[in-house]
Amino acid sequence: MKTEKDKVQAHSASSKSASVSDMTVGSPLRQICKFALPLILGYILQQMYLVIDAAIVGRWIGVGALAAVGASSSIMFLVMGFCNGACAGFAIPVAQAFGAKDYRKMRVYVANAVRISAVIASVVTLLSLMFCHRILQLVNTPADIFHDAYIFLMSQFAAIPFTFGFNLFSGQIRALGNSRQPFYFLITSAVVNILLDVVFILGCGMGVAGAGIATWLSQALSVVLCIWYIRKHMQLLIPHGDERLFDNKRTSILLNNGVPMGLQFSITGIGIIMLQSANNALGTTCVAAFTASMRIKYLFTCVFENIGVAMATYCGQNLGARQMSRITKGVKDAICLMLVYFVFTFIVIYPFADWMMRLFVDSGEAEVVSRAAQFMRIANYFYPALGLLTILRYSIQGLGFSNLSMLSGVMEMIARCGVSLWLVPALTWTGVCLGDPVAWCMADVFLIPAFLWVQHRLKEQAI
């Protein structure tokens, strides 16, 4: 039975449409688009920042510095991917409780998620800083860029608590259907980051260390903004009294959602590190080409990723409300949306890939431009496979089957390891270009039957 306090806060939630959004009513496509658009704009902005950051590093410090930042990218994906995945998993029970209108349970989840996140962030930060040098050695980082890569990576690892904090609190805000505020915070963080890049790199001559410190400070700002917004406008999320106490059952549910999702990203990251290691062995030119192409690739593929993130919240809320037919309709609508976007990317990438790569390096670096453009075009052919992967994976996560989504990450890892061991030695750079497409297709082979099984399982439970 709901307390009087819950009833008041439920009324507050319904009246403050700017703060929360109920995705269990209305057109599924409209709800998904409404939720995904701020996410997409935010991530495009974030990726544009990374493009500008790479351009500043590549043009004002040099190709070697750009390669140093790129040599760290796969390691960052491994570590930060775990943090981001775990926080996304912690938001799933919050979304489900919100969809079921059980606000007390929701706040218990929030309190325990904060407690778990503080422990995980501390441990991950300590281990990352301790083994940073050794990890760079294991991935065959070229000697001429090793020092810069080490400095940059250490500065990124020092920012893990802030990265974890932003993903945790923004995930809880999004669990209530509000994706706009995290978007505004990303805008603020990105602008501050770019300004600090200019100050530290161009003004102070701090090199790649300046880029790392700029990221550290901007991430800290984004955490402060999230906490301020929750306290000011989303009191529904703030635990009170015994809701703050440790709850073994809720903690177990949070870990069952968060750890598999975190491991999924880390397992995928292992495959990316294997691919990065194989690419590093090809020399600084290929490392720089990989860095430039990945920056532009993420600018385009973040749309697929964020349609998926929208599906996790959408499925979580509708599962809580026991509306299975809306879940199926939403997945179909998301797939149609993904295919329309793929057509747009093909029209843009195929003719303009070379031009986009020249943003990063001087016109004299023709080989870097050519290789990076080849990477972009090959990956673009397989974007439908990536779009299907993100929609199905996040939908499965939102429905509470995070272990299955983790197994899809295992499939990606196996595929990338296979490419690294056999295709890259045989095809050199072309083999590197095939790493992502092969991984996406392998994951889809697993995810399609997995999603159909989850649908069948939940329908049986509802009978």
What would you call each of these model-derived segments?
Residues 57-77, 143-148, 208-209, 250-257, ...:
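Interfacial/gating helices of multi-pass transporter permease domains
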Residues 23-60, 74-89, 93, 118-125, ...:
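N-terminal transmembrane alpha-helices
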Residues 48-67, 136-143, 199-206, 266-299, ...:
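Helix-terminus/linker motif at the lipid-water interface of multi-pass membrane proteins
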Residues 66-126, 163-182, 289-353, 386-408:
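Small-residue-rich hydrophobic transmembrane alpha-helices
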Residues 87, 155-174, 182-190, 211-224, ...:
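Short runs within selected transmembrane alpha-helices of multi-pass transporters and secretion channels
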Residues 34-53, 155, 166, 189, ...:
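Transmembrane helical elements of multi-pass membrane transporters/channels
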Residues 78-81, 125, 193-197, 223-227, ...:
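Hydrophobic transmembrane alpha-helices of multi-pass small-molecule transporters
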Residues 1-36, 94-159, 203-259, 315-382, ...:
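Short alpha-helical transmembrane segments in multi-pass integral membrane proteins
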